[in-house]
Curated annotation (Swiss-Prot):
One of its GO terms (biological process) is cell-substrate junction organization. Keywords: Cell membrane, Cytoplasmic vesicle, Endosome, GTP-binding, Hydrolase, Lipoprotein, Magnesium, Membrane, Metal-binding, Methylation, Nucleotide-binding, Phosphoprotein, Prenylation, Protein transport, Transport. This is Ras-related protein Rab-8B. Its cofactor is Mg(2+). It comes from Homo sapiens (Human). The gene is RAB8B.
Length: 207
């Protein structure tokens, strides 16, 4: 059967239990919202194909369990991820504080140049906010990561978040292909991991 997409990107949603990762996934993949989701057991995924710059990109989005007892299972999925969204709940201070621990997990288990984005979810619940937008932005700047506040319930910034991450991945792939073409003088293209550019790339376009 003919392939119906030009690229396949594997994305990962990580963060504490209850921050809304599953709700974000369902909002993006099915444009649906459900307040009765139970906590993810282990890992699950959804697929949505989008179009960017005339190319069809199949997004395979993995939703991971936030509980400690599933950590060994979920970290096994970090390695093949091309983009990772770190999600916290703006009404839950602890989930924000733990973003640093999740970043440490990425550094230990994921590819060194994986694209990352921090999402402050549940921004529709501003009356219960414990984490200011400014604190989220500062944390993102400190790590050289893009940042958005989202709401799976109202759908605010959900599309933008996934499209931005996909575009960043595609930009990186295109640059690697161009670099390979220049180096190979027309030879076969081989996409390789470039560890030395990790920090400088993320700081090109903040927030």
């Amino acid at each position: 059967m003919a392939k119906t997409y030009d690229y396949l990107f594997k994305l990962l949603l990580i963060g504490d239990s209850g921050v809304g990762k599953t709700c974000l996934l369902f909002r993006f993949s099915e444009d649906a919202f459900n307040t009765t989701f139970i906590s993810t057991i282990g890992i699950d995924f959804k697929i949505r194909t989008i179009e960017l710059d005339g190319k069809k990109i199949k997004l395979q989005i993995w939703d991971t369990a936030g509980q400690e007892r599933f950590r060994t299972i979920t970290t096994a999925y970090y390695r093949g991820a091309m983009g990772i969204m770190l999600v916290y709940d703006i009404t839950n201070e602890k989930s924000f504080d733990n973003i640093k621990n999740w970043i440490r997990n990425i550094e230990e288990h994921a590819s060194s140049d994986v694209e990352r984005m921090i999402l402050g979810n549940k921004c529709d619940m501003n009356d219960k906010r414990q984490v200011s937008k400014e604190r989220g932005e500062k944390l993102a700047i400190d790590y050289g990561i893009k940042f958005l506040e989202t709401s799976a319930k109202s759908s605010a910034n959900v599309e933008e978040a996934f499209f931005t991450l996909a575009r960043d991945i595609m930009t990186k792939l295109n640059r690697k292909m161009n670099d390979s073409n220049s180096a190979g003088a027309g030879g076969p293209v081989k996409i390789t991991e470039n560890r030395s550019k990790k920090t400088s790339f993320f700081r090109c376009s903040l927030l």
